[in-house]
Amino acid sequence: MFNANLIKAITLDLDDTLWPVWPTIYKAEDLMREFLQPHAPKTVDFFANKESIASLRKKLIQDNPHFAIDLNTLRKTSIHEVLSMHQEPLELVDPAFEVFIQARQQVDLFADSFDALKRLSSKYKIVALSNGNANVFGMEIGQFFHDAVSAVQAGVAKPDAKIFNLAIDKTGFQAHEILHVGDDAHLDAKA
């Protein structure tokens, strides 16, 4: 039986729990394409075609299954592949990725997220637990987090118990003293 009085820490999903993820991703992709446009217009056209890029990413994940949890490497490899495919400058891979990942951290929190984190962090240790590549410590809300665990760190994605166990270890508490909050009933509740 659940006893809220036992809770000492909260593990917290990020994307679509604290902010809507897709507007952030779309804006980051737009900024990356703007950066690439003067130097790699064919690459920009390819990235603008959602079916083409989805097909490429699917193939990359089939060939490299770890890319399914390592979204940064997947994105860098995608950029490299598309630049190479169109014989455009490969030295754009790292700066294009940096434009994307910096914009990826510019999230628009849901209206109550900041105040809720502030209030909760005064009573509980909060650990970010995400399959994504957002870095809470690069955001204003980072001050409310004790630690963060990503799928890349754990070597597995939610709902695998290993990622939850790593987050439990980061809190220093036992599993029954931790509440997980997320937006996905399958990914955030199975373990």
Task: List each model region and its residues.
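Substrate-recognition "cap/lid" segment bordering the active-site pocket of phosphatases
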Residues: 127, 132-179, 185-187
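A general structural motif
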Residues: 4-7, 123, 175-177
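Short, well-ordered alpha-helices that flank and scaffold nucleotide-derived cofactor binding pockets
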Residues: 30, 34, 122, 169
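Hydrophobic/aromatic ligand-binding patch that stacks against planar heteroaromatic rings
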Residues: 191
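Acidic active-site catalytic centers that drive phospho-/nucleotidyl reactions
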Residues: 13-15, 20, 131, 183, ...
